[in-house]
């Protein structure tokens, strides 16, 4: 078949990689580079080279089984890394890191702080209660994180110094917007990534040489089928296929794969 693929993120590139073996594929990319959220900046400091990932950074052995198999097939190496959460609030003077007990109480004054211990109690309560409430159908689709926290009486220290900054860091959102986040999605994401447990956590990994290191081997077999700077303007469906209207003109295909964000 003649297949059009729109978007060159991991979904589009993997689709092209697999389908190119038996089909005539064309990959359309609006930007002048491929890789989607994958973006590595190479930096040299004092003669030492660093590959800094500013987009896709890490993956884990719980939720990325297909990606791991793909990297193994491509021969792309990875290595284990740590994922920890730290908070520093100059206004309140609060500072901690959740990686170990020692780093949790890096500020020894927190050992005697009722508010800090209250935050820890709220963390344990939230981790248990929110999973039960979701399983019992007590969390409606329209319920936000902020509504739930207010209704259940969670402390301000837990809100300001744990759950809101953690969510904002994960989704790159302003702190003020995090309380309006849909709670159902929030809980499912946290549960799937081991963030609602203090003991059972997945092993995280990084691509050696930076995340962009997988792009070249992934695209090697169909590099000539990639069209950069070629945004798709319209897709018309027919009984026997589709018409793709892009910067390159109008073309017919048997199938189309939308490997892009829904608002694109």
Residue ranges and their predicted role:
Residues 11, 33, 263:
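Conserved Rossmann-like nucleotide-cofactor binding loop
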């Amino acid at each position: 078949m003649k297949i059009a693929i729109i978007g060159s993120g991991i979904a589009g590139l993997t689709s092209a990689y697999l389908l190119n073996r038996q089909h005539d594929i064309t990959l359309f990319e609006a930007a002048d580079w491929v890789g989607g959220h994958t973006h590595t900046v190479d930096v040299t400091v004092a003669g030492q080279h660093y590959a800094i990932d500013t987009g896709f950074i890490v993956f884990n052995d719980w939720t990325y089984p297909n990606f791991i198999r793909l990297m193994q097939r491509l021969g792309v190496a990875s290595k284990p890394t740590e994922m920890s959460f730290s908070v520093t609030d100059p206004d309140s003077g609060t500072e901690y890191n959740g990686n170990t007990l020692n780093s949790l109480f890096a500020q020894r004054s927190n050992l005697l702080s009722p508010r800090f211990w209250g935050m820890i109690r709220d963390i344990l309560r939230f981790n248990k209660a929110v999973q039960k409430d979701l399983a019992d159908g007590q969390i409606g689709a329209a319920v936000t994180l902020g509504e739930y926290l207010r209704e259940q009486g969670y402390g301000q220290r837990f809100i300001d110094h744990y759950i809101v900054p953690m969510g904002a860091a994960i989704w790159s959102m302003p702190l003020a917007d995090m309380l309006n986040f849909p709670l159902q999605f929030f809980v499912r994401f946290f549960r799937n990534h081991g963030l609602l447990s203090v003991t059972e956590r997945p092993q995280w990994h990084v691509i050696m040489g930076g995340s962009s290191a997988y792009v070249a081997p992934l695209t090697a077999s169909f590099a000539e089928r990639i069209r950069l700077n070629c945004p798709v303007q319209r897709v018309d469906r027919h009984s026997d296929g589709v018409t793709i209207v892009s910067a390159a003109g109008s073309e017919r295909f048997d199938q189309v794969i939308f490997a892009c964000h829904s608002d694109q």
